């Protein structure tokens, strides 16, 4: 019984961890839209805008990657099963 509860909680936790990708996707979309708007307003600043955009997108993507790593750990290398003797 405890094994089923731990497995279900791990699956729910993995789903919540993957949901961090939603926030990252929305943030990246907004950032790209604002960057395109800024390049349209000031084409001469394209290099600065692009480098700032890429740095911001990389930081936003890191939360999605961390969520993916946590979900993979919970699903395939579940550390909670060792406490149940499995």
From Swiss-Prot:
The keyword Glycoprotein does not apply. It is a multi-pass membrane protein. It is found in: Cell membrane. The chain crosses the membrane at residues 4-24, 57-77. One of its GO terms (molecular function) is lipid binding. Pfam families: ATP-synt_C. The record marks 61 as: Reversibly protonated during proton transport. GO terms for cellular component: plasma membrane; proton-transporting ATP synthase complex; proton-transporting two-sector ATPase complex, proton-transporting domain. Keywords: ATP synthesis, Cell membrane, CF(0), Hydrogen ion transport, Ion transport, Lipid-binding, Membrane, Transmembrane, Transmembrane helix, Transport. F(1)F(0) ATP synthase produces ATP from ADP in the presence of a proton or sodium gradient. F-type ATPases consist of two structural domains, F(1) containing the extramembraneous catalytic core and F(0) containing the membrane proton channel, linked together by a central stalk and a peripheral stalk. During catalysis, ATP synthesis in the catalytic domain of F(1) is coupled via a rotary mechanism of the central stalk subunits to proton translocation. Key component of the F(0) channel; it plays a direct role in translocation across the membrane. A homomeric c-ring of between 10-14 subunits forms the central stalk rotor element with the F(1) delta and epsilon subunits. F-type ATPases have 2 components, F(1) - the catalytic core - and F(0) - the membrane proton channel. F(1) has five subunits: alpha(3), beta(3), gamma(1), delta(1), epsilon(1). F(0) has three main subunits: a(1), b(2) and c(10-14). The alpha and beta chains form an alternating ring which encloses part of the gamma chain. F(1) is attached to F(0) by a central stalk formed by the gamma and epsilon chains, while a peripheral stalk is formed by the delta and b chains. NCBIfam families: ATP_synt_c. Belongs to the ATPase C chain family. This is ATP synthase subunit c. The lineage of its organism: Bacteria, Bacillati, Bacillota, Clostridia, Peptostreptococcales. The gene is atpE.
């Amino acid at each position: 019984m405890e094994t089923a509860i731990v497995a279900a909680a791990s699956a729910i936790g993995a789903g919540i961890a993957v949901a961090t990708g939603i926030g990252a996707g929305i943030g990246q979309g907004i950032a790209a839209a604002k960057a395109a708007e800024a390049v349209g307003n000031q084409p001469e600043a394209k290099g600065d805008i692009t480098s700032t955009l890429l740095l911001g997108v990389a930081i936003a993507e890191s939360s999605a990657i961390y969520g993916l790593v946590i979900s993979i750990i919970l699903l395939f290398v579940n550390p909670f099963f060792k406490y149940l003797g499995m």
